[in-house]
Amino acid sequence: MAERPPLILASRSPYRRALLEQVRLPHEAIPADVDESRHPDEPAHDYVLRLARAKAEAVAERRPDALVIGSDQAAVLGERVLGKPGSEARAREQLATASGQCVTFLTGVAVVHAAGGRRQSDVVPYRVHFRDLDETTIARYVALEQPLDCAGSFKSEGLGAVLFQRMEGSDPNALIGLPLIRLFDFLLACGYPLIGSEE
C-alpha cells in the first residue's frame, strides 16, 4: 500500500480533532492564522465556505506536501447568524431564541493538497429542531455543559441532545464541526487510503 501523505487539520478545535481520532486518521493540528470576520451582508453559506478554504490554504502554504483540512461552521436561525456565545449570558440568550425553532448549521469543509494541485470544498447543512425550552432548563444546561465555544450554544455530543426535538441531515458529524462523509469523499479523490496502516 502506498504511504499516506501527512494529514493536517487547520484548526485548534478539540471537537474536530476528536472526530478524526475516532475514525483513526493520523493527523497533526496546525491552527490557521486567518481573519474570521464575516463580511457585511455575506451569506452564511459563503462565509463558512470562504473560511474553510482560507484556513486550509493558509496552512497548505507552509506544508504543500500535506493534505490540509479546513473547516468552519455557522448556525443560522431565519436571517440571523448565531456565532459562538463566549459567555453564559449570551449562551442563554441564544438558546432562548432557538427554543421551539429550527436552526440550520452550515459546515464548510475544504481539503487542499498544494503539491498535487488539488482543492476541494463544500458546505454541508444540518438542521436541528429545538424543543420548547424553559428558562430553568436553559440555565441548568448552560451551567453544566459550558457551551461557550460552540456555535448555537450547545454540544450535540453531550447533554445538548436533550434540547432537541429532531435532527435532519446527511451527516451528524457536521453538527460537531467536521462533515466526515464529505471529507472522506475529498480524501479518496486525492488517493488517500482511509483504512490503512496507522503510523
Swiss-Prot record:
InterPro entries: ITPase-like_fam, Maf-like. The keyword Membrane does not apply. Its cofactor is a divalent metal cation. The record marks Y15, Q73, E157 as: Important for substrate specificity. Disulfide bonds: none annotated. CDD domains: Maf. It is an enzyme of class 3 (hydrolase). It is found in: Cytoplasm. Its main location: cytoplasm. Belongs to the Maf family. YceF subfamily. PANTHER family: 7-METHYL-GTP PYROPHOSPHATASE, BIFUNCTIONAL DTTP/UTP PYROPHOSPHATASE/METHYLTRANSFERASE PROTEIN-RELATED. This is 7-methyl-GTP pyrophosphatase. It comes from Alkalilimnicola ehrlichii (strain ATCC BAA-1101 / DSM 17681 / MLHE-1). The lineage of its organism: Bacteria, Pseudomonadati, Pseudomonadota, Gammaproteobacteria, Chromatiales.
